[in-house]
Regions:
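Basic, polyanion-binding surface patches
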Residues: 1-165
Length: 165
């Protein structure tokens, strides 16, 4: 059975949803990361992700300038750090260093991987477009990595107000 509902009520029923970190690198070498819920796989040949990133996010600026980024699926142990990445702006803050998380070199891009993530995907920017008020970024996956510990669980967003578990 269905009933008419305001969009906010209907959107509230989508949880739990995935959350990823879009990792970028500033010109001065700082590691920047942003928590993103608007993400999906849009192609498997070639493999591609689509991200919705609010403008004027520092992450979006870095992706536009560098043409590369990493998508990391944080573990359930990273809720505090993921919340930090999603609520603090990177223009003037060294988010990578202040998070306390470990980053390691990637294979094909000049952006680090999140060492203890469930999975990391090295991406090159394919295109960006704006069908509504939020820019959409498409990145082609050029390398992927998984955690060697299969018991590491993925972090999910369980509701409005950053209910990360």
């Amino acid at each position: 059975m269905q009933k008419p509902a305001k969009i906010e009520e209907a959107w509230g029923r989508k949880y739990p949803e995935q959350v990823v970190l879009a990792i970028t690198k500033a010109p001065d070498g700082r590691v920047n990361a942003m928590a993103i819920g608007w993400v999906c796989i849009v192609s498997d040949d070639p493999p591609m992700f689509l991200l919705g990133i609010d403008d004027p996010a520092f992450t979006l600026e870095l992706i536009r300038n560098n043409k590369e980024f990493v998508i990391a699926y944080p573990s359930s142990e990273m809720a505090k750090e993921t919340l930090y990445f999603g609520t603090v702006h990177g223009h003037s803050e060294d988010k990578g260093a202040k998070s306390g998380l470990k980053f390691i070199p990637a294979e094909k891009v000049d952006v680090p991987l999140l060492a203890d993530a469930v999975a990391n995907f090295e991406c090159r920017l394919v295109t960006e477009y704006r069908p509504g008020n939020c820019p959409l970024v498409v990145g082609e996956v050029i390398a992927s990595h998984v955690n060697t510990d299969d018991s590491v669980k993925r972090l999910v967003n369980c509701g409005k107000g950053y209910q990360l578990k």
